[in-house]
């Protein structure tokens, strides 16, 4: 680290990544997953270090993320899904609640979560965003895993074996 600046670290080697993918709007979600997994591989994350689980829809994503976070087995998590506006208020409810749940899990369990739940007005908008959003989630997960792992190391610096400041 130079001059107190932490450089972006997109090296995924040795990182363990959990992915929760919603199945609702499946073609969009599959495209998100494919782009995300391909980018994780490009960043050096080994296939055996990635666990993918699927859930029915975006509202179920936070619970699966919570279970993964509770396990302590992952350096970062990724949420993938698509909420496409319909003719009812359900769109707002699902979008808001899934987003809030994802954020809460990350903060409650001190783990980076890349939120790749697309919220769009149309199928066409969702399909147009899948490739870039999937790749972005992979990059975000790797960068934030490295950052949080390194920042966790700062907490240990300057403490004795009992966790007291020296």
Curated annotation (Swiss-Prot):
PANTHER family: 6,7-DIMETHYL-8-RIBITYLLUMAZINE SYNTHASE (PTHR21058:SF0), 6,7-DIMETHYL-8-RIBITYLLUMAZINE SYNTHASE DMRL SYNTHASE LUMAZINE SYNTHASE (PTHR21058). InterPro entries: LS, LS/RS, LS/RS_sf. It holds the Pfam family DMRL_synthase. (2S)-2-hydroxy-3-oxobutyl phosphate binds at residues 87-88, 129. The keyword Lipoprotein does not apply. It comes from the Bacteria. It is an enzyme of class 2 (transferase). The active site is at residue 90. This is 6,7-dimethyl-8-ribityllumazine synthase. Catalyzes the formation of 6,7-dimethyl-8-ribityllumazine by condensation of 5-amino-6-(D-ribitylamino)uracil with 3,4-dihydroxy-2-butanone 4-phosphate. This is the penultimate step in the biosynthesis of riboflavin. Belongs to the DMRL synthase family. One of its GO terms (cellular component) is cytosol. Its EC number is 2.5.1.78. Pathway: Cofactor biosynthesis; riboflavin biosynthesis; riboflavin from 2-hydroxy-3-oxobutyl phosphate and 5-amino-6-(D-ribitylamino)uracil: step 1/2. The keyword ATP-binding does not apply. It catalyses: (2S)-2-hydroxy-3-oxobutyl phosphate + 5-amino-6-(D-ribitylamino)uracil = 6,7-dimethyl-8-(1-D-ribityl)lumazine + phosphate + 2 H2O + H(+). Keywords: Riboflavin biosynthesis, Transferase. 5-amino-6-(D-ribitylamino)uracil binds at residues 24, 58-60, 82-84, 115. GO terms for biological process: riboflavin biosynthetic process. It comes from Ralstonia pickettii (strain 12J). GO terms for molecular function: 6,7-dimethyl-8-ribityllumazine synthase activity.
């Amino acid at each position: 680290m130079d001059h107190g600046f932490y450089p972006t670290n997109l090296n995924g080697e040795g990182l363990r990544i959990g992915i929760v993918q919603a199945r609702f709007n499946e073609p969009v979600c599959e495209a998100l997953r494919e782009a995300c997994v391909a980018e994780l591989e490009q960043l050096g994350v080994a296939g055996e270090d990635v666990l993918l689980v699927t859930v029915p829809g975006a509202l179920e994503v936070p619970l699966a993320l919570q279970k993964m976070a509770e396990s302590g087995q992952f350096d970062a998590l990724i949420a993938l899904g698509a909420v496409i506006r319909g003719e009812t208020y359900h769109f707002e409810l699902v979008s808001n609640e899934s987003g809030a749940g994802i954020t809460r899990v990350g903060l409650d369990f001190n783990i980076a979560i890349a939120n790749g739940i697309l919220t769009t007005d149309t199928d066409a908008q969702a399909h147009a965003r899948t490739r870039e959003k999937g790749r972005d989630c992979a990059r975000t997960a790797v960068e934030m895993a490295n950052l949080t792992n390194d920042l966790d190391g700062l907490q240990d610096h300057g403490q004795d074996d009992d966790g007291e400041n020296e």
